[in-house]
């Protein structure tokens, strides 16, 4: 497949804080990824927003850092059940991901094989580049949506346009991190931005 054949647009989506709600971890006092299936809660407006993107011809690709197993916080089986719970809720609304990409590693992990540096953890664009090659996606016509600076850096490194959800316009979030092309309050607003922009 030549570069000229890459014409399909995609929306690459972070998971926690974008599609489903973050959960308060009482041990750390921080809002984190859900550690139990019952804690998975799809954010309001997300299913119809994703359906609009899907109907407009965008491939939906989930790209998420999920280091809780590497950090010893949960089992691989639990991570799988959490994903299945989320997928089941979205399938009820006819939402289908072209690919689901989870990085299970962490630089400070405690489990062999999942600790240390890896090629796939965001901000690395590795998953986006793989999806481009496997599905013939045009990254220049695609978008990355996330709530963290690493999501925005990932998208920019891959050559997509970027939207930060839940951030203040013009604020990058961390010193030295890139500013998103757009900053909005929710996935619903992010979809309005995408569908209002011409294919470039």
Per-range role (PLM):
Residues 19-43, 66-78, 92-93, 111, ...:
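Metal-dependent phosphoesterase signature
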Residues 10-12, 61, 143, 182:
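Hydrophobic "anchor" residues on beta-strands that sit immediately upstream
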Residues 46, 50-89, 95-109, 155:
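Substrate-recognition element of Asp-dependent hydrolases with the DxDx(T/V) motif
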Residues 2-59:
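Active-site neighborhood of HAD-like aspartate-dependent phosphohydrolases
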């Amino acid at each position: 497949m030549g570069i000229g054949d890459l014409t399909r647009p995609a929306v690459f989506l972070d998971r926690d804080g974008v599609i489903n709600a973050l959960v308060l971890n009482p041990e750390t006092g921080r809002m984190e990824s859900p550690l139990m299936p019952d804690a998975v809660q799809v954010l309001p407006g997300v299913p119809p927003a994703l359906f609009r993107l899907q109907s407009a011809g965008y491939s939906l690709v989930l790209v998420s850092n999920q280091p809780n197993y590497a950090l010893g916080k949960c089992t691989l089986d639990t991570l799988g059940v959490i994903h299945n719970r989320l997928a089941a809720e979205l399938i009820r609304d006819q939402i289908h991901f072209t690919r689901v990409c989870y990085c299970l590693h962490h630089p400070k992990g405690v489990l062999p094989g999942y600790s240390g540096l890896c090629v796939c953890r965001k901000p690395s664009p590795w998953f986006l580049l793989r999806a481009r090659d496997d599905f013939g996606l045009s990254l220049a016509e695609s978008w990355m949506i996330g709530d963290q600076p690493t999501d925005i850096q990932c998208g920019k490194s891959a050559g997509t346009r970027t939207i930060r959800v839940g951030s203040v316009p013009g604020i990058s979030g961390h010193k030295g991190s890139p500013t998103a092309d757009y900053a909005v309050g929710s996935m619903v607003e992010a979809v309005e931005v995408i569908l209002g922009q011409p294919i470039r």
